[in-house]
């Protein structure tokens, strides 16, 4: 994960509480795809005690804003097919399902849905 966060073509955002402790983070990898510059959400994680407080939404919206300002036209991510909470979360943010990738999580042999979102032009 550290290699993604430190890459030149990455957006890495960290949410902190008042005392400086980390409450969550998001890492977005930027790359040229068939439709232009794309952002791929490598990971989004929020500490359990800070979930359902808007931390994940703020991280994602800021990552999308920064990506859009850099010329990213589309964001993409994968989510475990059984993670109903995450699926609802991403759909609320405007992501739509674009297929399934079998055994995406190879170690556990689990499938993942591919989600995408078009970003507004800046």
Regions found by a protein language model. Give the residues of each.
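Beta-hairpin "wing" of winged helix-turn-helix
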Residues: 98-100
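Conserved acetyl-CoA-binding loop-helix of GNAT-fold acetyltransferases
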Residues: 46, 52-65, 84-92
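Short coil/turn segments at alpha/beta junctions that flank glycine-rich nucleotide-binding fingerprints
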Residues: 53, 70-73
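Acetyl-CoA-dependent GNAT
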Residues: 1-49, 60-62, 66, 70, ...
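Residues at secondary-structure transition points
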Residues: 32, 36, 54, 58, ...
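C-terminal "cap" of GNAT-fold acetyltransferases
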Residues: 12-13, 73-76, 80-87, 93, ...
């Amino acid at each position: 994960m550290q290699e993604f966060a430190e890459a030149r073509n990455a957006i890495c955002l960290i949410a902190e509480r008042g005392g400086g402790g980390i409450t969550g983070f998001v890492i977005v990898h930027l790359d040229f795809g068939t439709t232009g510059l794309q952002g791929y959400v490598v990971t989004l994680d929020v500490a359990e005690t800070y979930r359902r407080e808007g931390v994940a939404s703020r991280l994602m919206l800021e990552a999308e804003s920064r990506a859009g300002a850099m010329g990213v036209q589309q964001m993409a991510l994968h989510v475990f097919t059984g993670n109903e909470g995450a699926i609802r979360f991403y759909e609320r943010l405007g992501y739509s399902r674009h297929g399934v990738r079998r055994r995406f999580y190879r170690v556990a042999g689990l499938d993942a849905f591919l989600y995408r979102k078009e970003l507004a032009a800046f």
